[in-house]
Amino acid sequence: MNLIKHNDMKWNMTYKIAALLFFSLPWASVGVCAQSATSSQSPQKQKVQKRETYEWEGEIPTYVEQLKQELTYPMAWGNSSIKNFSKWKKAAREKVLECMMTPPKAAAAWDMQVLEEEQRDGYKAQKIAFNVNAYSRITAYLLVPDGGVSSDASSDIPSASSDISGATSFSGKGTGRKFPAVNLLHDHGAHLFIGKEKMIRPFGVLSAKKASVASLREANSSDSISDKEKAIAQEVLEDADAWVKLLYEGQYLGDYLAKHGYVVFSMDAPMWGERGRKEGVDRKKYDLIAGNMMMLGRDLSAFMTYDDISSTEFLASLPMVDANRIGCAGCSMGAYRSWMLSALSDRIKVGASVCWMITTDAQLTRRYGRKENGGFANCIPGLRQYLDYPHIASLACPKPMLFINGSKDHLFPIPGVEDAFRQMHEVWRSQKADERLDTEIWDIPHSCGIKAQAKILEFLDQYLKK
């Protein structure tokens, strides 16, 4: 690729990323677009057809308050007729899994392969492939601190488990130190081009060939890297750096934790990164695809959670991982994934969630001027007839859990956050474990900056490095 073409590609990509980040985040202002909107070159805005009467305002039905009054959450701890906490957890978890609909079939074996690796500052970065379920062989990033058991020998990796709670115990072979581990769960951000790369810095251009899924399918392909592959690898790298600079203050959470002695794993959620559409990224297609999955008797959001449970089982099977010291963490949708995973997997011993906790009452309302309300990424059919978000998160009790929300986060109104935190503390307090639930409201927007990452590390260290 000549220099002119490369620079053009880089400029176009940078412009598109800047525009995407600007308009997708809650604090973005639309005022700066006024000049371009009045330009004579701008196309005329299409007229919106409207009738005199209506039944929806924005994305919410006009009778939403009536519907919410009917949500009594009968399976919440304290509302349920089950008064034994262990029995309640079992019944409530079963209800959540029932509403998540049919899970993907478990893979017969993980069949892990190391596609490429590079040495970083005190740890090794690997791009791997494994079977997360019977349908999907995916790529993921794995960071291993120096001195750990090698993951190169696939014979040391046990078979996939069909036990969704993590009750079965694995013990990897090999010699070397075992480390605590973290399953890092990426955000949504209305940005689907990258997923795991938001958590762990991707490899550079020279690793593109060996680290591509296509190379797994083309065993006889050339080792040379095409201009197209170089361009994609460079775009992924620059896109990830730009995203992390904006939402994570320029620090990759996964690399940060690996430097401090954790095995770190991160994969793409369905529809993100290397699990997206053949035709390319189109945010508007997400809801259509979620609808198609429901037509197939499956739920896209639930598939994300099922895969998070499965990948945690995979992480526990690795020989360099201490299976009794595994935590999870994430920001935004990653925070939602983190407390869902903590609630449903016994493998997880500690969880951290930054900028995702609310009540349905505060989420689906016009009271706080939210621009978006709900969405398929956290939609599990019928579950609100039984449990609200804080009730589900309370299934993690008495595990240590960290929740941080921001007072400047327009996606999660503080009254709803405080109400959710109050409900969770009631549950932990009822089990004499309130000191293990850390809920904090910081003076931050929707983000996970350096201070929040330091708090996550401190919390993980407190419970995984005793």
Question: Where are the language model's segments positioned?
Answer:
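Proline/glycine-enriched tight loop/beta-turn segments at coil->beta junctions
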Residues: 135-138, 146-150, 172-182, 188-191
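N-terminal cap/lid segment of alpha/beta-hydrolase-fold proteins
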Residues: 102-149
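N-terminal pre-domain segments of enzymes
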Residues: 36-98, 102
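Cap/lid segment of the alpha/beta-hydrolase catalytic domain
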Residues: 177-178, 184-306, 316-317, 362-365
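Alpha/beta-hydrolase fold nucleophile elbow
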Residues: 320-332
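Mobile cap/lid helix-loop segments that gate and shape the active-site cleft of serine hydrolases
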Residues: 288-295, 310, 350-393, 413-421, ...
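C-terminal catalytic histidine-bearing segment of alpha/beta-hydrolase fold enzymes
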Residues: 376, 422-466
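Short beta-strand/loop motif that positions the catalytic acidic residue
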Residues: 403-405
